[in-house]
Structure formats: C-alpha cells, structure tokens
C-alpha cells in the first residue's frame, strides 16, 4: 500500500506525538534533565494540537482500514491533547520535589496520549483494543509513580490486576462478535448487524463481555470498584489524566462504535445499558456524600458523570442531538475536572509525601488564597451543573436528549442525581470560606497564578464561565465534528 501526502497530513497528530516519544526517550538516555524533557513533551503536544488545523484543511478520509480521520476524530484528539498538556503542566512543579527519576513521567503521559489519539480515530475493533491498551499500560506506571507511598503502590497494583482482567473480557467479547459476524471493522459489523442478527445468543454474549470490559475502563457501576482507591492513591496530576483524557478517548470510541453498529436497536442491550446508567448515577452520587477526601469524592462523582453520558449514548439511535450532547458535556467535564484537579495539584506541589487531598486542607483557603478559592468554587458549581457554567449546558443537553428519546426513568435519575450532587459539591465550596484553622498544614505557593499550572487552572475557570454564559462557539465546533458515515 502506498501512502499519499494527504494520508500523512491526516495522521499528523499521531506522528508528532510518536516522534516526541522517541525524542524524549533519546533525551533521557543522553542526559537526565527535568526541565528539558518537560519542555520537549509540552512542545510536542502543542505541535500536535496546532497540526489539527492542517488535518481540518485536508478533509475527512479513511487513512487505513483501522483509522478514520474526520471531524469527530479531530474533536476528541483535541480534547485528549488538551488533557495531556494540562497533566504535564501540573506534573512539573509536583515532580520538582520528587526524589527518584522524574523524566519517565512525561514519557508515560505521551504514550498514553498516543493511545487516546488512536482511539479518537479508531474505525476497527483492532484499533479500539490497541488504543485502550496504549492508554492503560502507561497508567499502571503513572498511578504508582509515588511508589514510596503505600497508597500509590496499592492503587497501582489494584488498577493493573483489574485492568488486565477487563482487557481479557473485552478481547473475548470481540472474539465472539468476530466468530458470529466474520468482521472487525465498525462499518462491516454495522452492515451485518442490520440483517437482524441482534437476537443471536453468541453475538449478545460477545456484546455483553465487551460492555463489561469497556464498563471497567469507564468506571461504570458495577465495574467501578477500583475508581475511588486509584483516584486517591495516584498522584494529583495522574488523577487529572485518569479523570479526563482516558475517559474522553474511550467514551468517544464507544460512541462511534454504537453509531455504526445499531446495537441500540436491541431491547436487551438498551435495558442493560439503562440499568448500568441508572446505577452509576445514583450510586456514584450517594457514595460521594460521605467522602472527606477530595480526590475520592471526585472519583465517585466521575462515576455519576459517565452515567449521565450513558443516557445520551442510549438515546443515540433517536437523533443527531446525542452526538452534540456528548461533545458539549465532555468539553464541560474536561475543563471542570482540569480546574478541580489542578487546584489539588497546586496545593500538593512540590512533592512532599501524600497529596493535599483531605477536605480539611482546604478549610478557610479563601482567607489567604482568594482567587484559587474562587476557581475551585467555579469548578464545583460547574460539576454540579449550576446555570451560568459550562456544566449546566452539558447537563441540559443530556436531559433534552433523554426527554426526546422518552427515557423518562433515566431523566428522573439524572434530576435526582444532580440534586444529590449539589450537596457534596457545595460542601467542598463552602469549606473554602469557613474560618481558617490555626495551623495551616498545606498551602499553594504565594505566586501560584504566575506558574504554568496556575495559568492552566485560570484559563479553565474562564472557559467554564464564558462558555457557560455564551456556549455558541463550543456548540458550533461540536456540530462541525460529525463522523464520516
């Protein structure tokens, strides 16, 4: 097969991040220099982001049987690159105090970003599996990066074992789907499934196993047990990546899979997904009520956010608006999570043992870091879905899609879940304004707003507010990001 210049341009983000991985590897082999490797990584990710403009000029195409580059792939590639950039930015001050090798951190983030970009354009079950593994394997190392702390090491072992089990379920499910249909490409699967094959037990078993594997990666109930422990044990910058890039990339590819394969037409699959969404929304919110650790709280809340997204996925067959709802919701979730985890990262930098993740560490923060407290408040309000924030626009879309598809019981779950969520998000926000304790145990640096991480957090807060009041630019971008059918 000959590769044309157009195909090379379409693959630019993938090639640039791949090249950055090689350059950073050689740089580490040549001389360990934390600043140099961090700069190379950030430059590579920025170059990949800029290259999306050229990809857009190039038009949509199938580059190989495995990868399809279209507006949809570009949107999710952009979101993954933004999350990876923020992760590297938050990691730099955190790693400054880290005693062991610092440079490999960036290498692992870049490899995981490579997996995310591959997933955004995946058009084949082989690409889906490769992408998921490329994201998961570096995360085993990243979650346990602070391995001298028992909690980080424990989180890494839990995540590794459960992730391996989930991958085997996913692979076995794919094998059963292949045995039944004789195809692995999304489009070919869609064609063969359209011929009333959705009642075959072997195919339903394969889809069931794939839902188990993907449910683990997306931390949906009942495959969520690793989530709070891993979010708490992982370093704050890694939790940022886990909550944003990996979830966005995997949900993006699941959405494409469901779009091409009319799986939603099967009543059995719809009921199973509906029950998973309902359980994730209610359980995630109820468990977050009693948490006193911010990272654990955000872990449980991420379970409920993916439950909300699942409502749009189930409604996918009933209209175009579901794609739009998911795009807007994920963008809002990305910026809100970057801000919230960014504040935790700033409070925990440089590395001094455990992160500043207990709710008590944030009590009275307003009285000596007013702007940082305002940012955290905006993020909590956005995650809760309060009007005038981007989180509200996303939640409104999900509710509209649910109503349009007549999923009344799931719409009720979203409303009840949001009401419960309001309590624990406001609990975090209110604690920032209480009287400060006599002795501060953790605090952000006094010049935090001039650091790269501080700038990322401030930009996230600004985007959440501006796009919450005037969401049209974001909605226009998401509407352009249509998958090639």
Swiss-Prot record:
Any one biological process term the GO annotation gives: ATP synthesis coupled electron transport
One annotated Gene Ontology cellular component of this protein: plasma membrane
Entry's EC annotation: 7.1.1.-
Pfam families xrefs: Proton_antipo_M
Topology in membrane: Multi-pass membrane protein
Class of the enzyme per the UniProt entry, highest EC level: translocase
Segments crossing the lipid bilayer: 8-28, 35-55, 75-95, 105-125, 127-147, 159-179, 203-223, 235-255, 271-291, 297-317, 326-346, 374-394, 408-430, 455-475
Catalytic reaction list: a quinone + NADH + 5 H(+)(in) = a quinol + NAD(+) + 4 H(+)(out)
Keyword terms of this UniProt record: Cell inner membrane, Cell membrane, Membrane, NAD, Quinone, Translocase, Transmembrane, Transmembrane helix, Transport, Ubiquinone
UniProt keyword Membrane, yes or no: yes
Localisation: Cell inner membrane
Molecular function (Gene Ontology), one example: NADH dehydrogenase (ubiquinone) activity
Domain of life: Bacteria
Primary residence: membrane
Subunit structure: NDH-1 is composed of 13 different subunits. Subunits NuoA, H, J, K, L, M, N constitute the membrane sector of the complex.
Family: Belongs to the complex I subunit 2 family.
Function summary: NDH-1 shuttles electrons from NADH, via FMN and iron-sulfur (Fe-S) centers, to quinones in the respiratory chain. The immediate electron acceptor for the enzyme in this species is believed to be ubiquinone. Couples the redox reaction to proton translocation (for every two electrons transferred, four hydrogen ions are translocated across the cytoplasmic membrane), and thus conserves the redox energy in a proton gradient.
Protein name: NADH-quinone oxidoreductase subunit N
Organism expressing this protein natively: Klebsiella pneumoniae subsp. pneumoniae (strain ATCC 700721 / MGH 78578)
